[in-house]
Amino acid sequence: MDGWRSRFKRLHRTLSVGEEQCTPAIKLNSPDATLQTEACAPEDEGGLPPVQLCGYLSSTRDRLLTAELCAELRPLMPSRIQLYTKWCLLYSLEQHGASLHSLYEHVRPEEPAKARVGYLLIMRDRRGGLFGAYANEPFRPTESRRYSGNGECFLWSADLHPMLRLRAYPYTGLNEFCIYCTSGFLSMGAGSGHYGLWCDEGLVHGVSERSPTFGNDALSREGPRFHIVALEVWRVG
């Protein structure tokens, strides 16, 4: 755990946007013209190869994940997850419709995973705020009061202008309320009547307040209550 926590010593990292120009390699690999885009992010300090982003349609206008954001989020993930170079878009509000049920259906693994993978949640609010969460397992509804997830989970928010600045909120160990999903909402982080990140079944309204689980500030620029403009879930690995 100490080794994992050391990755969060630098929670404010900066990256100049647009310093390196590149032409994505595009492969049409399905009847619905799904694109595979090879992100031209430079190798990070650990010498990891660049990430390949797969799943955006050619018609998709709202694309939340960029090579620059990948480069900032990747070092915060578990070491074994950092080694993966293929990140796949499982759910997009624009591509699949605004429905939590649809999100669960698209995120659900088709077969048992042969190796552990990670899941990245990204949201954007009406003021352009970009934020989300990393989860060690897929989001799936439960009717019990049992939380899931472990200490690998974290919340994050990002400022895009004038340069990309990422702020991450790692697991504090104060409680085990990492992930809790039902048919009516999805949430990460909780305690004392507050959710670190919460969204409703229509993926229209969200809540982000300080939670003991992650010790986070409100992630949205709109404040504790926000409107969801765009949302994506990615599988890392």
Curated annotation (Swiss-Prot):
The keyword Zinc-finger does not apply. The gene is OXR1. Residues 63-237 form the TLDc domain. InterPro entries: TLDc_dom. This is Oxidation resistance protein 1. Pfam families: TLD (PF07534). The keyword Mitochondrion applies. GO terms for cellular component: mitochondrion; nucleus.
